[in-house]
């Protein structure tokens, strides 16, 4: 099956003009770009999604409004998916770990409004279950999916730490999966860099053959977007060069997918 391979324009790409980022990624062999809010005012095609990772637990109205802005920008640019989190985002300075009912009410209430705005704009909202947030494993993600009409951005790396069965989750959520992140990890629940790390594709504990087979079984034909978060390698080996990271990752994707060399 031919797959659309995308790359999240994070890392030091966020400091570069959108046209330069897009051209660099297309030259590196990608089919599209997953933009972040760093480029929300200059979104260019081809694009797979717009990532808007606001903290809906403690961010209040400003977090919801920022997501509204992302939805409107995506709609104007012809981007069909905006990726979101519940929060709190524990990797951000000053973030506080919360798992109380007030936090859940804030996150679910914000997501309900965001879902309504997405529906009005014709943009799907992809919730990413993510470490350090309320929706971080199968059970907490399911709580959101049962309560709010949002879809799923599926990142298998986060379920490595929680021990949830990745292929089974893909089949459970099926048609609600609208975006997929290519990222690997190993470790246990805790803090990034201490208890677990995100590593190179194929070097962690994501069961890639089974994961890809599950995607085939549900008929997933959406984008697969590389999220490069092997930060130590990025800084110490690649010298903070995002183009080098993108090229390296594209080769790893080709190996995972069995693409001809």
Indicate where each model-derived feature is located.
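Glycine-rich, proline-tolerant flexible connector loops at the mouths of alpha/beta enzymes
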Residues: 34-44, 86-93
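The substrate-binding groove and active-site-proximal loops of carbohydrate-active enzymes
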Residues: 54-61, 199-202
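Histidine-acidic metal/acid-base catalytic patches
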Residues: 1-29, 78, 112, 137-154, ...
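A generic structural signal for well-ordered alpha-helical segments
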Residues: 25, 42-45, 74, 118, ...
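Active-site acidic/histidine proton-transfer and metal-coordination neighborhood
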Residues: 4, 15, 19, 58-151, ...
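Conserved beta-strand positions in the central sheet of alpha/beta enzyme cores
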Residues: 34, 49-51, 83, 126, ...
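N-terminal substrate-binding region of glycoside hydrolase catalytic domains
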Residues: 24, 28-41, 51-56
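Conserved radical SAM core fold
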Residues: 55-56, 88-92, 186-190, 233
């Amino acid at each position: 099956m031919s797959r659309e391979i995308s790359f999240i324009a994070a890392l030091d790409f966020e400091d570069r003009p959108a046209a330069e980022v897009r051209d660099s990624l297309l030259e590196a062999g990608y089919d599209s770009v997953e933009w972040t809010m760093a480029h929300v005012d200059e979104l260019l095609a081809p694009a797979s999604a717009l990532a808007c990772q606001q903290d809906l637990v403690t961010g209040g109205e400003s977090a919801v409004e920022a997501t509204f802005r992302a939805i409107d920008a995506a709609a104007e640019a012809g981007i069909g998916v905006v990726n979101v989190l519940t929060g709190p985002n524990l990797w951000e300075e000053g973030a506080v770990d919360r798992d109380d009912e007030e936090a859940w009410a804030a996150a679910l209430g914000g997501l309900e409004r965001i879902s309504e705005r997405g529906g009005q704009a014709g943009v799907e909202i992809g919730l990413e279950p993510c470490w350090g947030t309320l929706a971080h494993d199968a059970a907490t993600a399911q709580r959101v999916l049962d309560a709010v009409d949002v879809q799923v951005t599926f990142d298998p790396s986060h379920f490595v730490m929680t021990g949830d069965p990745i292929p089974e989750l893909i089949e459970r959520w099926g048609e609600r999966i609208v975006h997929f992140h290519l990222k690997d990890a190993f470790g246990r629940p805790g803090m990034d860099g201490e208890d677990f790390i995100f590593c190179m594709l194929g070097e962690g504990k994501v069961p890639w053959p089974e994961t890809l087979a599950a995607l085939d079984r549900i008929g997933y034909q959406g984008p697969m977007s590389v999220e490069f978060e092997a930060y130590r390698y990025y800084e110490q080996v690649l010298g903070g060069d995002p183009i080098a990271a993108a090229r390296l990752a594209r080769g790893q994707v080709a190996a995972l997918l069995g693409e001809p060399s």
